[in-house]
Amino acid sequence: MMNTPFDPTNALVPMVVEQTAKGERSYDIYSRLLKENVIFMVGQVEDHMANLIVAQMLFLEAENPEKDIFLYINSPGGSVTAGMAIYDTMNFIKPDVSTVCIGQAASMGAFLLSGGAKGKRYCLPNARVMIHQPLGGFQGQASDFEIHAKEILSIKEKMNRLMAAHTGQDYDKVARDTDRDNFLSAQESVDYGLVDQVLANRPDASNSDAKK
């Protein structure tokens, strides 16, 4: 009998059981939290992850277009195109998307963190944020290198302008600050304008998460 190596991605997901008038109903923990308008963005930003997050946001909008969505981010970054699919959907849908950094938000993760609804972007106390310029790699014939180099520079300029708008920083400052890996603590992220507040405790129940 062969021993199958442990794959953490296939580890059991916790289940929760609810009592209803029709009996018991079980959910995996992420589906149960989705009912509370909570979405997780954990790990590398790539097309499959982006597709799932976009689908969840569209579903929650259809369920209640007036209720805020909470996007919890713990990501080292990843694909620009996949990240922009999430970003554009955040802006396209009617509900505000509140972003919360848990662990880390680096690269595209930091960009999406800053792109949450103004006044509703948060870091937990020991989270960290890292901003830098887009990374690119290309293999092909020499005549295509210039084309791809121009595209990477265009993406860099666009993302810097968007981050400047989200943070309130000057474009030139953002361009300088993202030229190399730039790590920020939770409070430094507030000072920079990437997030609005460090959350050490859950806000009071009087602070409604629904739009008025």
Swiss-Prot record:
GO terms for biological process: protein quality control for misfolded or incompletely synthesized proteins. It catalyses: Hydrolysis of proteins to small peptides in the presence of ATP and magnesium. alpha-casein is the usual test substrate. In the absence of ATP, only oligopeptides shorter than five residues are hydrolyzed (such as succinyl-Leu-Tyr-|-NHMec, and Leu-Tyr-Leu-|-Tyr-Trp, in which cleavage of the -Tyr-|-Leu- and -Tyr-|-Trp bonds also occurs). The keyword Protease applies. GO terms for molecular function: ATP-dependent peptidase activity; ATPase binding; serine-type endopeptidase activity. One of its GO terms (cellular component) is endopeptidase Clp complex. The active site is at S107 (nucleophile), H132. It comes from the Bacteria. Keywords: Cytoplasm, Hydrolase, Protease, Serine protease. Its EC number is 3.4.21.92. It is found in: Cytoplasm. The keyword Hydrolase applies. Disulfide bonds: none annotated. Gene3D superfamilies: 2-enoyl-CoA Hydratase, Chain A, domain 1. It is an enzyme of class 3 (hydrolase). NCBIfam families: clpP, PRK00277.1, PRK12553.1. Fourteen ClpP subunits assemble into 2 heptameric rings which stack back to back to give a disk-like structure with a central cavity, resembling the structure of eukaryotic proteasomes. Cleaves peptides in various proteins in a process that requires ATP hydrolysis. Has a chymotrypsin-like activity. Plays a major role in the degradation of misfolded proteins. Belongs to the peptidase S14 family. HAMAP family: ClpP. This is ATP-dependent Clp protease proteolytic subunit.
